[in-house]
Amino acid sequence: MDWKKLQDLLSGVNQYSTAFGRIWLSVVFVFRVLVYVVAAERVWGDEQKDFDCNTRQPGCTNVCYDNFFPISNIRLWALQLIFVTCPSMLVILHVAYREERERKHRQKHGEHCAKLYSHPGKKHGGLWWTYLFSLIFKLIIELVFLYVLHTLWHGFTMPRLVQCASVVPCPNTVDCYIARPTEKKVFTYFMVGASAVCIILTICEICYLIFHRIMRGLSKDKSTKSISSPKSSSRASTCRCHHKLLESGDLEAVPADDKLQASAPSLTPI
């Protein structure tokens, strides 16, 4: 598997991600992909070859191995890493769609026309929803794979001895021994822990996106209210100053008749 191409594809997501997304990407590549490529593949590389059973019955060892390992840990983790990084491609595709739409708009209306998007990679409008759904998909995928891993092997431990009972073509209960169980258990705990960290980071990023969206909406409401309120506030302040001047005696009260005369229009003969 060429992890370098996957890294090159996902490196473009960094410029559209939040701080939590950048940390998530670092955890994926440093603590999961590198550990998978450098160490985990070697530990599980010869697991079927070193799976020993105390029987000479042809085919019994293979059947017992398949009974206990329906799918290998290393292949399950490879699928998990591929599936968990695929939702990030949605963001890249959406940004590419915006850029292409902007390019066609400029070709049609000229270079000096108004832009469709102030910044194609800014998380506003549909791109915000695409980013949010990609995070939800990643969270669901992580949880599903952890559940599958826990269900297939009845936990995250790696036993030294497994027994195959009533499995054809094995004649009776067969004891089988797993190679390097302690080392495999350590790597399993490490990969599960890294997956749990990614789940926490994804939840934090979802909460951050929603909180940031709410705060931005509240700030827009405040700005619209502040634009519409200066006239009323200036009138109120003028009235307060007028009453204070009347109370201090600096301003004489105008009689009602003078007010009427002042407010009445002056009519001149034609």
From Swiss-Prot:
Please indicate if the UniProt record lists DNA-binding as a keyword.
no
Membrane topology, record value = Multi-pass membrane protein
Query: What's a Pfam family in this record?
Result: Connexin
Supply the alphabetized keyword list: Cell junction, Cell membrane, Gap junction, Membrane, Transmembrane, Transmembrane helix
Disulphide bonds annotated for this chain are none
**GO-annotated cellular components:** cell-cell junction; connexin complex; cytoplasm; gap junction
Q: So what does this one do? A: One gap junction consists of a cluster of closely packed pairs of transmembrane channels, the connexons, through which materials of low MW diffuse from one cell to a neighboring cell.
User: What is the protein's given name?
Assistant: Gap junction beta-3 protein
Record lineage: Eukaryota, Metazoa, Chordata, Craniata, Vertebrata
